[in-house]
Amino acid sequence: MDVANTENRCRGFTLIELVAVLLILGVLGSGIMLRWAPGDQSLSAQADLFARNLRHAQAMAMARGVALVLDVKTASNYAITDGTATIRDSAGALQNFTLDNGVTLSVSNLRFDSLGRPLNGGSLMSAAQSWTLSGESSTETVQIQPLTGFVTVTP
């Protein structure tokens, strides 16, 4: 009588399990290393956020059919206003923003008309407008193009 001997089987991990664990550890490790990387990481993130808020102000002006202003109040605070008061988005959130970690912004306002076109005073912009965001050791520039309102961020 031949009885299968299961007691002598080697126990361990399969190749797929080992590869999956190494892959997960690699992803987690790279995320941790990026957070510990030297340099002013928050400056880049804040410049991207400022650019997104410019696009958001433009989109809200078109959606609402009214002129809106990106109002840079101080070097570390800006808001989306109707020219007098800070507005709320469709979710009810007040559109007031503060830069973090000592990042500062050059003070210059921008108005969008109801078609989303950037204005300089009361007329269409004829040249690009720029804002400089400054961190501890570097700067980034956010620029908006005339007529289209295309926004770019450059280090």
Please describe what each predicted stretch is:
Residues M1-L22, V27-A51, R55, A59, ...:
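N-terminal helix-rich module
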